[in-house]
C-alpha cells in the first residue's frame, strides 16, 4: 500500500517500502482509492513533469508489464464528465484506441465524452425546475450509457438502504438531526463581533502578494522571460492575483475557524509587509534592489486551496525595486499594515478562557461523555480545515479531557507527526487511528499487546476521505468548509455500513450570523477578488458564487446542512453516476442465472401481483420484446430488444421505456424480499380477472403501453433534431402490437 503523494517522491521509505528499490512498472493490478484526486488529468500546462497524474501514467501504467486498474471513488464526477474520462484514461494508458476497440460504440471515447459534456452544459442552463435527471438522460447519447455500463459499478448509501437487504451486509446507523452551534466570538463586554472584523478585512488590498502590479510598463518585458511560466498558461501576474484572492477569502475562513488561526495569519502577513517595507527603505538608502516575491505560508490554507496551481507551479521570482513604482507600493503596504495592527488589537483579549467557541466545544464534549448516545461510547471526532486550529484545539481539549475525565486525546494534521496524551504510544497516523477506532481498524490483530485507547480525535481533512472510523458515533465540524461536499465526506468516516452504533450525531459550528448575511458576505469577498487573468484552477468551490442562481443554490445547500445530513450525491449540483448505469442489474442477472439456468425455457406472459407504495402507484409494469431484433426504435433504448413501460390504472404513463434504470429500480424495490405469491393482493386481482380468464383491462393497458412507446419515440425523434450526434427520426418505423411480444408483467395493486 502506497500513497498518491509517493508518486512524486524520488526516494525514502513509505509504509515500510523502500521507494528507491520499488519497480513501479511491475504490477498486474493497481487499485487506486479516492481516484477522483486524478480527475483533472495531465492539465493544460506544457510543463507537467510535477503532475501526479502524469507520474502515475508514466511510472506505473505505461511502464513494464500490462497493468489493469481498479478505481474507487465516492465522487468520480465533480461538475464535468471530463473528470470521469480522465480517470478512465488511466486504465487505457491515455491511448483511446485501446478502449475504442473493446467498446460496442459507434463513436470514439473522446467524441462520446465531448458530446456528453455538451449535453450537460446545455442542461445546466435550463431553469432549476426543468433541470431534472430525466431531462438530462434524454439528451445523452446511447454510446455514453454503453461506456458507463462497460466500465462502472455504482452504489450509494441511499441506494443500498432502499434496494438491498441489509440483514446480510449490515445496516447503516440512524442519523440524528444535526446540531447547529452559533457561538459568538467572545463573551467579553463591549468586545468586537464577526461583522466588525469583516468590515476591516474588506479594506485590505493585500498588495504584498501582487508586486508585479507595480512594475513599470516599460520594464514588464524584462520579466516575461524570467518568470517561472515558460510554456505555462498561468502568468506570474495571474498567479499573484490568484494567491491574493485566495488569501482574502482565506482570512474569512481562518476567522470562521478560530480566533487563534486568524491571529496567526494576521501576524504572518504583517511580518511579510514589515520585511518588504524594510527592503524598500534599504534600497532607498543603500541601493540594494533585489526583492523576492513572497509566498504565502502553507499553514494559512486549507487542503483544497493548497492544491491549486498557484502553489504547485513555478518558483519565486526576483524583482528589481528600481523597475517598480515602489513608493506607491510602500504606501499601500503601510495602509494594510495599519489595518492588520488594528485587527490584532481587536482580538488580543480573546484568550482561550474568553474564546466562546472553544468553551462551547468543551461543554459539548462534557455533555457527550456524560450522556453518550450509544451505550458507553465516549468517542468524538473533531474536524477543522486548518492545522493551526487543530493544534489549538488539541492544546486545550487534551488537557481538559484528561483532567476532568481521565480520557486520552490525539491529533493528526498531515503536516507534522501526530500527537497524543497516551504515554508510550508513537503518534503515527496508523497507530492513532487504530487506537481511536479499534474494531474497524482491527486493533486486536495489529496491536494485540497495546491497551491504549483514544476517545477524542482532532484532525484536519487529511483523513476526511478513505478512513473507516465507525467505532465513533459523534462528529464535530469545528468550522464549516466552504466546499459543502467536504462536510459530507467528513461525516462519511463514521456513517458507514455495519456500524456497531445505533445512532450517529453530526455537530456543525456556524459563524454567529444570519445565513443570508453569511452567504452575501462570502459573495462580496469572492466578487471583489475575482480577477479575469486568473485561470480557472483558482476556484476552490464546486460552484461559482457570483451568479445569483448559484448563490441561491449555495444557500439551499447550507440550509439543508443545518437541518439534515445530506447524501453526497444530493449535494452536488450535477448528476450522480448512480442515475446512469445499468451494470449492477447485469451482475444481478448473471448471479440469478447461476441458480436458475432454465430461464430461457420459461413461458411468455408470466405475471405476479405486488402491493403498491406511495412512490409506486397502482398500475402495470410491462416487459416487451421487439420481435425485429435489428430494429432499435430510436437508437436510444439501452435494453433493446426489450422495452419496459410502467402504465397507471387510468392509462397514464408513470415511466416510459427511455428510463430503464428507474423501471428496474422500481421492480427491484417492489419485489425485494418476496419469494412467494402475496395472497392479499393476488386474491383481489384474480377476482377482478375471473382467475385470469378475463384479461380485457390488462390487454387495454398493454395496448396503451405500446402506444406510449410509439408516442415517446415520436417525441424523441423531434428532440433528436436539436442535439449533436444525428437524428433518430429516419431510423425505423413501428406500427404497433405486431412489432412486440409480451415477456412478462408486474401488476402493482
Tell what function each PLM region has:
Residues 160, 501-698, 706, 710-749:
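C-terminal accessory region of SF2 helicases/translocases
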Residues 30-31, 458:
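Walker B beta-strand of ABC/ABC-like P-loop ATPase nucleotide-binding domains
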Residues 75, 353, 398, 402-517:
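Conserved RecA-like P-loop NTPase helicase motor core
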Residues 84-97, 473-478:
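A short helix-turn-beta junction within AAA+ P-loop NTPase domains corresponding to the substrate/partner-engaging
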Residues 170-188, 205-451, 747:
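Conserved Helicase C-terminal RecA-like lobe
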Residues 9-13, 38-41, 78-86, 107, ...:
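Switch/connector loops and helix/strand junctions flanking conserved nucleotide-binding motifs
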Residues 1-30, 37, 42-67, 71-74, ...:
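Inter-lobe coupling linker of SF2 helicases/translocases
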Residues 33-34, 478:
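Walker B catalytic acidic pair
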